[in-house]
Amino acid sequence: MNQEEFARRIETVRKKLYKTAFLYLGNETLALDAVDEAVYKALCSYKKLRELDYFETWITRILINECYNEQRRQKRFGGFEELPETAAEEFDSLPLKEAIKKLPKELKDVIILRYFTGYTLSETAELLKIPQGTAATRQRKALKLLKLELGEEVSE
């Protein structure tokens, strides 16, 4: 893969990457920064990618790691509260979003990747580097906790 092909592949997944980062970080600016950092890291090491078929999985894994790094930075430096800049940020106050934030990290990861980013169960397992059965179990546990938290029916 050369740089032109790398750029073309990035353009095909950029929106999905942003959506994933936004769901992890809950902030437009942080999400854009995380995507940029992930793309930069991928650009620096794209020649190490052995299977081009796994490009999307590979870049998404880099992005998730970058989101984790940003979350750690926010905890360490005590992120600041911002007023919503756009109507889309009002989504942060929705009960589902709040319930998802309360989930343990390993359950939240599965829910974000499965239901908000659209990955299959096997792709989710691959991205999280866990067996598919473990991903399915975490999905069931997360849905059960969300159902309890929201007090309503959550479909599988």
Model-derived features with residue positions:
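A short pre-motif secondary-structure segment
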Residues: 110-114
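Arg/Lys-rich amphipathic alpha helix in sigma70-family domain 2
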Residues: 48-50, 61-80
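Internal acidic/polar
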Residues: 69, 76-100, 120, 155
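A short, charge-rich alpha-helical start-of-domain segment used by transcription regulators
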Residues: 1-19
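Sigma70-family region 2
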Residues: 37-54, 73-75
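Conserved RNAP core-binding helix
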Residues: 18, 28-45
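C-terminal edge and immediately downstream basic/flexible tail or linker adjoining helix-turn-helix-like DNA-binding
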Residues: 4-6, 78-81, 126, 143-156
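DNA-recognition helix of helix-turn-helix
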Residues: 64, 68, 128-152
